[in-house]
């Protein structure tokens, strides 16, 4: 099993010492954005998360250790969801879960923004409740992790927790560039996508780092040659529809990043009413059982169906939650320049269109307005999904 010892290394950036962790391990399992306490700490979501860890993630760890003994787990932030208060049952679930994990494998956690009381890493952290767990290390400041096999250094990895300032995070990327092959972060990264699909601008610049960046924070899993957003381990809202969740394993000897899909946890999905009604009982239960499903019906088609029949089929499907979504009929709409009518565009596209039509505004301001709009809509969606 991997083990760790700590020493200090001087840092040109801070004038202080950069913590350095020497870790005997050849592989890293990445998980991120667990968000214990999601959906207002509902019992339903506590059950979802408990089952995920007990029935999928921990068995995955055990299987991996059987094949690759020198492996550790790294969580890339947002272990908890609520910055202000944590439900007692949620806290117990989190502690119990990480005690189980750390009992079988070394575990490292970097601060995410939801783990902090303030919007920087200067405040208190909810991760303090995990610091007394044996075999678990919480990383609260930029740290160099050196992974070794015997005396051979397989990889040097920079761990940069959420700092609350992309300028500071950029400086640390520059500091670690050339000294580490990977940077582990929890942040917004320019040119990647927010969960709502909007492009991130004015954030951390991954090009300042010579290696590859692996980050938490954005829930939608994304990969480019330069950046990997690990994403949340399971779908958490409608914004995750179509985004395959799972776990990454990095093999340090050859730099291979292996993705294992999570086909265990509930998913969010939308079904057209005709598709839903034409399914057999067996097909319907297979599709909806344990999942969150919106059944979409056009407003004009409502009179063609008996609502009682639809609700009866939904209620007997075994779904975690199934609800009817009435889609407004299209009325007197005009086509835009791209050939799509206004009601065919997303809210984000319509706002972008309005921003781009502003007169006397430079490109940088337009980009910043789009970024602010995107962040607001992401927060609004998250709040809506937790109702």
What is each PLM-predicted segment?
Residues 115-204, 233:
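Conserved catalytic scaffold of divalent metal-dependent phosphoesterases
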Residues 135-136, 181-183, 225-231, 311-322:
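Active-site regions of enzymes building and remodeling cell-envelope glycoconjugates
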Residues 15, 22, 26-27, 41-144:
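Core catalytic region of metal-dependent phosphoesterases/phosphodiesterases
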Residues 30-32, 72-78, 106-113, 137-142, ...:
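Active-site neighborhood of phospho(di)ester-bond hydrolases with catalytic His/Asp-centered motifs
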Residues 35-39, 81-84, 110-124, 145, ...:
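Active-site environment of divalent metal-dependent phosphoester hydrolases
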Residues 195-260:
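Conserved beta-sheet core of the metallophosphoesterase superfamily
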Residues 2-24, 66-67, 252-387:
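Accessory, non-catalytic peripheral segments of nucleic-acid enzymes
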Residues 99-103, 174-177, 203-209, 242, ...:
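Short, conserved loop/helix-junction motifs that constitute active-site signature segments
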